[in-house]
């Protein structure tokens, strides 16, 4: 029995090491493989599953589809239904029609994230019916949480709104229902996201009682699971890649957009074409499918989804998302910056080893794959230009001022006690760290040695 138990633990540690090895940060390695480019435009209405461009992260919870798009539902603690794109865009426009989930401490997330941890976020909080949050991170830097902005909106948890992220080499702009809400210029003091990004969406419990106080406050309070189910809706997603080609790669480790190479295409090479595509798709027309040869899916993928007639700018359709990476992180240690995957509580060692870090005077928790959520309350000052919000409503006094993201990785069942979560403590370190992989490997070697003592 002892041998079996140790062997099982050893295998899970090895699995964790291998899982971490699959994630390659181009700023830390010059051997990262190119990522698949979209290189085209499409509109997905999710009337028959996730469609050809998205894939489930296979977390607990349910993702249902129908005439009203997707429903991502948490039925119990540790659920974290979430999905991601099977392509990347290099500058582009993403429109999502969504409705956030109701429920104190429940976070509905939709965001873009790159392999070197640039990130652009849209988040809603189930206990705040008056606001949504825009946020961004640069190269996984979570030393401060002053990039987030809170914006008034009417009924984001009951009504569907169209949220737009327009990302160019010069600025990032968030819009809601046709009105510009916030703009971040490329030369802002906090830095600028400029590397190929995938799309993530999901719902998770930031208010799980095992999370750190800062995370719970940010999410809006302790989650009451007796009020489940919690459901976020996503009716449609329109994506237009501003670059062309079959795949994107990093030519050096600078992380600048000028270092990105487009195989068979050009960075920013289809901006004008994308604008035409967007107009057609929003008006219910199809777009030229010739670009779809650049898509990671079969050439028919774009033609099938782009022919969908739903207008992504319509505020009447639902849409919702999640932290990739955002899976619910019931333990603040299980949350990781928007890379979407995970459940509300602490995962077992078979999933990943989480690293506790400190940034300034705030303790944060990150995973090796992404940024982190705040673990102690902090005041944020939104950078960038904020416009008057569409459908303004009184701001909720209960809204937290801590702004940040989420996410965690892993599939295994969470441990029952926060004290059981594996962690390694470091200081003055932010962004994705590779300690998890090293920790898992050392643990594996130690266990193997123990077996033969």
UniProtKB/Swiss-Prot annotation:
Residues 28-227 form the GH16 domain. GO terms for molecular function: glycosyltransferase activity; hydrolase activity, hydrolyzing O-glycosyl compounds. GO terms for cellular component: cell surface; extracellular region; extracellular vesicle; fungal-type cell wall; hyphal cell wall; plasma membrane; side of membrane; yeast-form cell wall. It is found in: Secreted, Cell wall; Membrane. InterPro entries: ConA-like_dom_sf, GH16, Glyco_hydro_16_CRH1_prd, Glycosyl_Hydrlase_16. Residues 281-343, 362-397, 410-430 are annotated as: Disordered. This is Crh-like protein CRH11. Chitin binds at residues 123, 204, 215.
């Amino acid at each position: 029995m002892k041998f079996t138990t140790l062997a099982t633990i050893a295998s899970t540690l090895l699995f964790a090491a291998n899982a971490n090895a699959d994630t390659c940060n181009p700023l830390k390695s010059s051997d990262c493989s190119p990522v698949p480019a979209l290189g085209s435009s499409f509109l997905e209405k999710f009337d028959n599953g996730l469609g050809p461009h998205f894939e489930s992260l296979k977390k607990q919870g349910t993702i249902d589809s129908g005439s009203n798009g997707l429903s991502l539902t948490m039925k119990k603690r540790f659920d974290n239904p979430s999905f991601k794109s099977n392509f990347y865009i290099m500058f582009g426009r993403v429109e999502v029609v969504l409705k956030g989930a109701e429920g104190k401490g429940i976070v509905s997330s939709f965001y873009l994230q790159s392999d070197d941890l640039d990130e652009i976020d849209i988040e809603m909080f189930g206990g705040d019916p008056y606001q949504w949050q825009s946020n961004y991170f640069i190269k996984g830097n979570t030393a401060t949480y002053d990039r987030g902005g809170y914006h008034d909106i009417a009924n984001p948890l009951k009504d569907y709104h169209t949220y737009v992220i327009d990302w160019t080499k010069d600025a990032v702009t968030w819009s809601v229902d046709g009105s510009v809400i916030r703009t971040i210029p490329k030369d802002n003091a906090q830095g600028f996201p400029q590397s190929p990004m995938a799309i993530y969406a999901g719902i998770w419990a930031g208010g799980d009682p095992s999370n750190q106080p800062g995370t719970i406050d940010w999410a809006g309070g302790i989650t009451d699971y007796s009020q489940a189910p919690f459901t976020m809706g996503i009716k449609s997603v329109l994506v237009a890649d501003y670059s062309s080609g079959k795949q994107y790669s990093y030519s050096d480790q600078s992380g600048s957009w000028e270092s990105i190479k487009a195989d068979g295409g050009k960075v920013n090479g289809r901006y004008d074409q994308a604008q035409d595509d967007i107009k057609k798709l929003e008006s219910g027309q199809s777009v030229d499918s010739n670009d779809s040869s650049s898509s990671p899916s079969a050439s028919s993928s774009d033609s099938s989804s782009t022919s969908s007639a739903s207008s992504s700018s319509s505020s009447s359709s639902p849409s919702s998302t999640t932290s990739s990476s955002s899976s619910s992180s019931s333990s603040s240690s299980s949350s990781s910056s928007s890379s979407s995957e995970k459940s509300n509580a602490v995962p077992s060692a078979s999933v990943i080893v989480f690293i506790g870090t400190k940034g300034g005077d705030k303790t944060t928790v990150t995973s090796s794959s992404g940024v982190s959520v705040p673990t102690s309350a902090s005041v944020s000052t939104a950078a960038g230009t904020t416009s008057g919000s569409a459908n303004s409503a009184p701001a909720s006094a209960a809204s937290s001022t801590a702004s940040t993201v989420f996410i965690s990785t892993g599939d295994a069942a969470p441990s029952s006690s926060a004290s059981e979560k594996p962690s390694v403590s470091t200081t003055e370190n932010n962004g994705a760290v590779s300690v998890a992989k090293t920790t898992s490997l050392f643990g594996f070697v130690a266990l193997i040695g123990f077996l033969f003592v």
